[in-house]
Swiss-Prot record:
The keyword Disulfide bond belongs to this UniProt entry's keyword annotation: yes
Residue ranges the record marks as coiled coil: none
CDD domains assigned: PBP_GOBP
Cystine residue pairs: 45-101, 90-110
Subcellular location: Secreted
Biological processes per GO annotation: olfactory behavior; sensory perception of smell
PANTHER family: GENERAL ODORANT-BINDING PROTEIN 19A
Functional description taken from the UniProt entry: Present in the aqueous fluid surrounding olfactory sensory dendrites and are thought to aid in the capture and transport of hydrophobic odorants into and through this fluid.
Keyword annotations of the record: Disulfide bond, Olfaction, Secreted, Sensory transduction, Transport
Organism: Anopheles gambiae
Record Pfam families: PBP_GOBP (PF01395)
Name the UniProt record assigns to this protein: General odorant-binding protein 72
Similarity field: Belongs to the PBP/GOBP family.
Source domain of life: Eukaryota
Length: 121
């Protein structure tokens, strides 16, 4: 299992890919971990970009099996149960939402609500 430090390093790498692409400031990106979600197309597409890179979702659709694997390999042990519970609660939260950026934002908010140990790059 990986350490908290390794997790944060990986998260920074992911963020560096998606942030410039969608012109998201550090303030807006950091606010996510406090439950503040910007209501802009750019932000929602940034979230979609991150979920894609993390292999949690592909174009706004949850990749359940892949996500479970990611939880096992990418997270420290003390975070795994909370992330599994969040995934379980949210796997179909954005079902039927056509716009993948919109769908990603719905998923993110659901994960935040259903996972007490929520962290996002």
């Amino acid at each position: 299992s990986i350490t908290q430090e390794q997790l944060e390093k990986t998260a920074r790498t992911f963020r560096q890919v998606c942030q410039p692409k969608h012109k998201i400031s550090d303030e807006v990106a950091d606010a996510v971990n406090r439950g503040v979600f910007a209501d802009t197309k750019d932000f929602k597409c940034y979230v979609s970009c991150l979920l894609d890179i993390m292999q949690v979702a592909r174009k706004g659709k949850v990749n359940y099996e892949k996500s479970l694997k990611q939880i096992d390999t990418m997270l420290p042990d003390h975070m795994k149960p909370a992330f599994r519970a969040g995934l379980e609660a949210c796997k179909s939260a954005a079902q039927g939402v056509k716009d993948h950026c919109e769908a990603a934002a719905i998923l993110l908010q659901c994960f935040y609500k259903n996972n007490p140990k929520f962290v996002f790059p």
